Every structure is written in C-alpha cells, then in structure tokens.
Amino acid sequence: MNSNIKNILIIGIGPMGLSHFESFYNSQKSYNIDLCDLSIKKIKKKYKKQKNIHRLKFFKTIPKNNNYDLAIISTNSKERYRIIKKLLKFNKVANLILEKFLFNRIKEYSDFQKIIKTYPKLRMINVNTWGNHILKKTGIRLTQNFIASYHLGNKGFATNLIHICDLFNELIKNEDFEILSNNISKIKSKRFGYDEISGRLMLKSSNGVLKIIDNSKSKYHILRLYDKKNSYTLQLNNKKKCHLFKNKKLIKTFDFPMARIFTENFFTRSLNKNVSKNYNFDNYKKISYLSQKILLFFKSKFKRFDLT
C-alpha cells in the first residue's frame, strides 16, 4: 500500500457501509480503500469500471497483514465483536469507526475492553452516533429541571434509542439517568432477526426528563425542550437539515450528519491536532456505557432482545 495515501477498510457494505464508502469515494482526496462483504461481487461489479482517483480492492473475507489508518465496521451487531477481534488479530489499525448498536451481549463489552488494553496502537475508537454532535451544534443551554420530549418519525424506536440517550446524556452533562417504560411490547424489526418495541419510554435524571414518543405520522424526528426561560423545537433530518426554533422563531439551520457526507470529513478532522479537544472523536467509552445501560434495560423487560 502507498504510505503517502490513507488506507481505509470498510467491513459490511449494507446501506450504512455504502454511505461511509461513498463519503470517501466522492472526496477530492485520493484513498486506498478496501471493501469487505459477503456479497462483494455485486459491489465490485458496480464500482470497478467507474473512473475515480482511488485504489479500490474487494474482499469476501477479512484481509490480513495490512496497515489501516481507519477501519469502519458497519456489520450487524450480532457479528460485530467477532469481526473486530479477527480484524485486530491479523492487521494493524490506527482508528476505528463502529456502527451502532455496538454489541448484543454484555460479555462482549468486557471482552472488547480487554482487547483494547492489549492493542495500544489504536488512537481513536468512534461509535457513529449523532445525538451529542447535534446538540452541540444547537448551542442550547438549559437551566435545571427541564422537560423534553422526543417525537420519533417513521423510524425504529429501539434502533434510535442510543442516539437519543447520547443526546440526553449531553443535556444532563453526563449525569446518571434512568430508563423508564410505559406499556412497552416487543415487535419484530424490519431487519430480519432483530427486535423493536412499541409503547413509551422516558429518560429521567436529577435535573431533567425526556419522554420518547412514537409518532409514525411525522417524516422526521422532533425534539421539544422547555425550561424556566425558553422553549426550543428542533426538527432533525428534515430533508437532510436540522432546523432549530427558539420560542417559535427559527434561529439556526445546519446539516444533519449524514454518513455519505460526514464520515470522510470527520476522519480528516480527527487527524488535525489543531481541532478543538471538545470535538467528540473518541467517544467509545461513553457510548459503550450507554449501550450497556440500554441493553440491560431491555434484558430486564424481555427474555431475549436483539438490537440493531
């Protein structure tokens, strides 16, 4: 591999993996990109003949004996730990981006932590969640005892919970919180072999609460926030944009962090030593904690629950 060009590996080329890939593929910078998927023939057929500035390689199994500046794992959650373990055993990786939901077994979190300790060359582990990023973009500062509601659009309830917990965690400044439920039931996810829920959830801390409401009629998510001074409404991913209203007046519009646009820029910024330390690149520790909180909650409600 050319040492002057960043080497990227993407494992799992479903919708999210493809979005990550296209972020690099559409860049004006040149990259060495390895793509790995069980259905790699279809992907290879689509991209091999297209003219581009990148070096592309296609693999059905995880490649070995390579040095990667970045590896993105966008497989299903059930197989993610096994794939990461094999990847790090046979390759040198500087940075990892992991899709959510991280792992579906509590033991895999502790096992992965052991791997991290024996793999000191990993400088960044990022989990692709957008709650923290979006809230920081808004610049919202709330007084204590706020009340919030999160209205889901026609997207999955459980599958978006990690994003919402990430957002709430930022609102309450990393304080601990409870996940409470009201008449929730398990239903089948649109993704085969995984679960979803219907009902209502609430996140509760000492200084605020957030009610999560399934509103399938809406085409986008809506966050409503109230404290003693102001009210805020945030439309999320409304035609790839976020619109923030303060006391019913539009005050800010910014891009929703779509992987197709965001990933390559995110990686480039993470390498820049001058970028503010407040930018949440290495968020694995926090998202791992939130993921386990969510997983334990569902395990307490249902005999078996598999998150995607």
Regions found by a protein language model. Give the residues of each.
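Short beta->alpha connector loops
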Residues: 14-16, 76-79, 102-103, 129-133, ...
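Beta-loop-alpha module in the N-terminal Rossmann-like domain of NAD(P)-dependent dehydrogenases
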Residues: 20, 50-97, 101-113
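NAD(P)-dinucleotide binding in Rossmann-like oxidoreductases
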Residues: 189, 194-196, 207-269, 278-280
